[in-house]
Design a protein with these regions (language model features):
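Active-site bordering "gate/hinge" segments
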Residues: 1-218
């Protein structure tokens, strides 16, 4: 981090996937006048898509990210629906929604415990050397660290059942999905979902205690 009398530069940002920097400009009184979030890298995915069949977009655009490919996969699938003027059947909509809910489990777990946790859980006054995932696990306990891994595994298991792969799903097509799920998979998804809800409720309470209950943040 670089600091002068009128500008603070944080480069690189370490609490997200990818590269970025923040520049904060101060006025004469030292108050924030403007803040800019910048992504200095060029990905070029828009150019990859030019000239390709529209049906390839849900698979191709998912490669934008290895942490949130489901978001890009689903956005492209819904764009394909619009291109073809089709409304997916109710079952396909429910399965897509279920896949996205599983993505919520993995993504929110990652962000709260691994990316945001080093700051939110450890607190702004914690030593820099302790503001990492190991520091978070030390504070919340090894048992909770195991549940974090279990939550990500549960989400990825459901994503694989519906999306075809644990990372970079490939089953959404214009008008629906290219595959369904079996009765056994449905029962397993229900079991994993109930466990994930319990873990989410625990995580919300932890957030309330450690973050909302910290006067430095609220």
């Amino acid at each position: 981090m670089e600091v002068d009398m009128q500008r603070i530069t944080i480069d690189p940002i370490t609490r997200l996937e990818g590269h970025g920097k923040i520049e904060i400009f101060l006025d004469a009184d030292g108050n924030v006048a403007n803040t800019y979030f910048q992504i200095p890298e060029l990905r070029g995915f828009e150019q990859f898509c030019v000239g390709r069949p529209v049906e390839e977009m849900p698979v191709l655009t998912g490669r934008i990210c290895g942490v949130c490919p489901e978001a890009h996969h689903m956005a492209a699938a819904k764009a394909c629906d619009a291109v073809y003027h089709v409304d997916p059947p109710r079952t396909a909509k429910k399965l897509r929604e279920l896949l996205y809910s599983a993505f919520y489990v993995t993504d929110h777990t990652t962000h709260f415990y691994a990316l945001g946790g080093p700051d939110f859980v450890m607190g702004p006054d914690a030593p820099v050397a302790e503001r990492n995932i190991l520091g978070v696990i030390h504070k919340v306990g090894l048992e909770i660290g195991g549940k974090v891994i279990q939550a990500r595994k549960a989400g990825h298991t459901v994503i694989e059942m519906i999306g075809g792969r644990k990372v970079h799903p490939c089953t959404s097509i214009p008008g629906g999905l290219s595959k369904g799920i079996t009765r056994e998979q449905r029962d397993e998804i229900e079991k994993l979902g109930r466990w994930a809800v319990e873990f989410a409720q625990f995580s919300l309470k932890l957030f309330g205690d450690l973050v909302l209950g910290n006067p430095a943040y609220v």
